[in-house]
A protein has these predicted regions:
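Phosphate-handling substructures
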Residues: 89-149, 206
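Active-site-proximal alpha-helix that buttresses catalytic centers in soluble enzyme cores
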Residues: 31-90, 96
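Short beta-strand scaffold positions
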Residues: 73-74, 148, 171-172
Length: 218
């Protein structure tokens, strides 16, 4: 049940709702105070602010008629809170998976992108306009690191027969979510594809025979 985090995994032969292809609803978490302050959050564990809570609740209202089979969330509190609020009242298992945690900014986490004296002059421009070649923060990750682990996460879903007809809610982050979506495009270097997703924006992906198609993009 949501709210009581369960470390479970469906195995081949377990029952899920049938009669549909695998469908993934990939959401970016709700707003936090650091989002509002334009700070690099990365893997710092920051809770949702009041606006983020309300936005997640509204998103849940908009998704109330969708029959989900399970929830997978980044282990960070802002992603788990978002999942719990969107899925409120449903008796669903929630799995946490570090492969969809946000990109780590290492020593730069907590820096404000508007007035930092620590961030290199071209870092933010690279981050937004050429993320695939963006420099790695000291002690942090590159986008290529996140592409690799989110691809591993995606492959573990499509290779599990128990999931082939499941509808799955995935609560993740801006960079990690876009890296996950890169699995469904030929050009994996164009990570943002037009922009950073807004808080609580949702992308819908349908997977059939191991091939994913983006049905709806935020």
């Amino acid at each position: 049940m949501l709210g009581n985090e369960q470390k479970i995994r469906l195995l081949p032969g377990d029952k899920v709702q049938k009669g549909k292809k695998m469908k993934l609803y990939i959401i970016r978490h709700g707003e936090t105070s650091w989002n509002k302050q334009k700070k690099l959050q990365g893997q710092r564990d920051i809770m949702l602010n009041d606006a983020g809570i309300r936005l997640a609740e509204l998103t849940g209202e908009g998704m109330k008629d969708i029959d989900f089979d399970l929830v997978i969330s980044s282990p960070l509190i802002r992603a788990k809170q978002t999942a719990e609020l969107v899925m409120a009242g449903r008796h669903l298992p929630m799995i946490t998976d570090r492969r969809i945690i946000e990109l780590s900014f290492g020593d730069w986490e907590g820096e404000c992108v508007r007035d930092s004296k620590v961030l290199p002059a071209d870092f933010i421009d690279k981050f937004y306009h050429d993320p695939y070649h963006c420099m790695r923060a000291p002690g942090g990750e590159s986008f290529q690191d996140v592409l690799k682990r989110t691809e591993d996460f995606y492959q573990s879903l499509v290779q599990n027969k128990a999931y082939e007809n499941a509808t799955i809610f995935i609560s993740t982050h801006g960079a990690a979510g876009r890296c996950l979506l890169a699995n469904f495009y030929d050009d994996k270097e164009d990570i943002w594809r037009g922009g950073i997703p807004k808080n609580c924006s949702v992308c819908i992906v349908e997977v059939k025979d191991g091939v994913g198609t983006v049905l709806e993009k935020d």
